[in-house]
Amino acid sequence: MTKRVTIIDVKDYVGQEVTIGAWVANKSGKGKIAFLQLRDGTAFFQGVAFKPNFVEKFGEEVGLEKFDVIKRLSQETSVYVTGIVKEDERSKFGYELDITDIEVIGESQDYPITPKEHGTDFLMDNRHLWLRSRKQVAVLQIRNAIIYATYEFFDKNGFMKFDSPILSGNAAEDSTELFETDYFGTPAYLSQSGQLYLEAGAMALGRVFDFGPVFRAEKSKTRRHLTEFWMMDAEYSYLTHDESLDLQEAYVKALLQGVLDRAPQALETLERDTELLKRYIAEPFKRITYDQAIDLLQEHENDEDADYEHLEHGDDFGSPHETWISNHFGVPTFVMNYPAAIKAFYMKPVPGNPERVLCADLLAPEGYGEIIGGSMREEDYDALVAKMDELGMDRTEYEFYLDLRKYGTVPHGGFGIGIERMVTFAAGTKHIREAIPFPRMLHRIKP
């Protein structure tokens, strides 16, 4: 019995006969030769079958029958294919399989997603099948590399995984984007972020991170928004603002390096410019203040490439502004110290300037916009209560959060990153819907 291996590992078996469990992604050939494009989730590569070889091995009757099976294979038929691994310099993968035997496991008739072009709605309706395509597999491999690198980075930096709840009894700071559900007769809400709970974790464990799904009822149809997505939140006690920015920069660079190391073929499939990714890792990220960014936007608003509306100090950025800023510097760019009026209640003011808060958004270049948001948290009980009263917030909804300031408060801060936005940036894809297996968007909840 031959050894069963995955496609990605065939390089270790050159000259040997192996068996691979795979699906037929495509098929071509004529006469005495057949070419199979095979995939198994780890990689794609080609298998070649020669009719004379089958006749020689199995005899004329059985050999012709087996070769006829290969000729009749349809797209996405599942098979066990056996063959000799050979190096192939013509192939991007570098190897091919000289097929010696095949066994059909599951037939596939009239597969909906043929090699021709299909519309987006059709592909999204068949997302469960579209996932199998070469480019979609590549994007999900990059997603996997980013998730793996996330756990690796925080483990190396002394953070503990801390699981915050998905159901919450209190509305977060933006109640207009909440999904509400009934919790045994009491209103409950799907989590928008685990941050408030992570702050409790940081007071117990020092450094914590959470990774899980969050939900925002955003009635937005842009290429950067989902109603359900995966968020990594980190929280760190005894932290300064500069230390937080350093950590965020190191984290994003670790994610990019993780993709380069663990998913090089996926990047090649997507034709991602890896030299750009390497430059983002090598060069320091740019850091500017919100007010410097506004000044810069005003200075260049009449430039030919300035496709954005005029902003005054105090206004929030839109996507065109974020795109222009990050493209202007050509590297990921931190915009720091936003106006308190457009940021969350828990953010700590800039010392000596209460109109600005110690926060930063990291803007990715190439038009990908914000991928990280972070801030120092207000650790002073009286200052936080005053801010909540100013905004008309109900303190009773945040009793546990205020307790953190009453019992051993410390300087602390953190940040969050939407994994799908990071995947989109790393993969170089145009729309966030491809960065998650089953996207949930406005008007899209199936399959």
Swiss-Prot record:
Its main location: cytoplasm. It catalyses: tRNA(Asn) + L-asparagine + ATP = L-asparaginyl-tRNA(Asn) + AMP + diphosphate + H(+). Its EC number is 6.1.1.22. Keywords: Aminoacyl-tRNA synthetase, ATP-binding, Cytoplasm, Ligase, Nucleotide-binding, Protein biosynthesis. Pfam families: tRNA-synt_2 (PF00152), tRNA_anti-codon (PF01336). The keyword ATP-binding applies. The keyword NADP does not apply. Disulfide bonds: none annotated. GO terms for cellular component: cytoplasm. SUPFAM superfamilies: Class II aaRS and biotin synthetases, Nucleic acid-binding proteins. PANTHER family: ASPARAGINE--TRNA LIGASE, MITOCHONDRIAL-RELATED (PTHR22594:SF34), ASPARTYL/LYSYL-TRNA SYNTHETASE (PTHR22594). HAMAP family: Asn_tRNA_synth (MF_00534). This is Asparagine--tRNA ligase. It comes from Streptococcus pneumoniae serotype 4 (strain ATCC BAA-334 / TIGR4). The gene is asnS.
